[in-house]
Amino acid sequence: MALILPCTFCTSLQKKNFPINRRYITNFRRGATTATCEFRIPVEVSTPSDRGSLVVPSHKVTVHDRQRGVVHEFEVPEDQYILHSAESQNISLPFACRHGCCTSCAVRVKSGELRQPQALGISAELKSQGYALLCVGFPTSDLEVETQDEDEVYWLQFGRYFARGPIERDDYALELAMGDE
């Protein structure tokens, strides 16, 4: 049975003008909870039960966009990413990778809770301090967040590892590395 359901990974590639033929999950069986898209990426699938349709709770999400000086308020179902839901409502929020690997969509949670199991771009330490990624975040309650500067979050996470003082140029080492003696 072919299920016409957009795969977020494939949709993201298409938005970046990556040529793909289909954007849909095609190998879905009745009662299954997972399927795969054309790139063989596992995708969670929820379907209505035979007793009636599944009702997914929605939550009010308020985003204070510091860079643009605006406040966005919108509803997000618990089973949708906050960034994707905002975009479907014509709300522009900062992002880059859409897969939880960078810190472009990083926010600081002011109130409420969210679930972000795929947020690889943010450490457990920063998550415990209230940082989150909108591109892979699902609201679990009404939520109020504030956007952060990407460099600020990146520095908090990686700065202590790379900040060892200025880098001195070594032309001789550069010549050796390039094979020019």
Swiss-Prot record:
Q: Where, subcellularly, is it found? A: Plastid, Chloroplast
Q: Which domain of life is it from?
A: Eukaryota
Question: Does the keyword Kinase feature in the UniProt annotation?
Answer: no
Q: Would I find Electron transport among this entry's keywords? A: yes
Q: Name one GO cellular component term.
A: chloroplast
Give every 2Fe-2S ferredoxin-type domain span. 59-151
Residues annotated as transit peptide in the record: 1-44
Up-regulation conditions: Slightly up-regulated in response to acceptor limitation at photosystem I (PSI) in plants lacking of photosynthetic [2Fe-2S] ferredoxin (Fd).
**Which keywords fit this entry according to its UniProt record?**
2Fe-2S, Chloroplast, Electron transport, Iron, Iron-sulfur, Metal-binding, Plastid, Transit peptide, Transport
Cofactor(s) demanded: [2Fe-2S] cluster
| GO terms for MF | 2 iron, 2 sulfur cluster binding; electron transfer activity; metal ion binding
Write one Pfam family the protein is assigned to: Fer2
Binding note for cofactor: Binds 1 [2Fe-2S] cluster.
Which positions in this protein are listed as binding [2Fe-2S] cluster? 97, 102, 105, 135
Q: Tell me the Gene Ontology biological-process terms attached to this UniProt entry.
A: electron transport chain
Report the function annotation for this chain.
Answer: Ferredoxins are iron-sulfur proteins that transfer electrons in a wide variety of metabolic reactions. Mediates alternative electron partitioning in conditions of acceptor limitation at photosystem I.
Protein family (similarity comment): Belongs to the 2Fe2S plant-type ferredoxin family.
Descriptive protein name: Ferredoxin C 2, chloroplastic
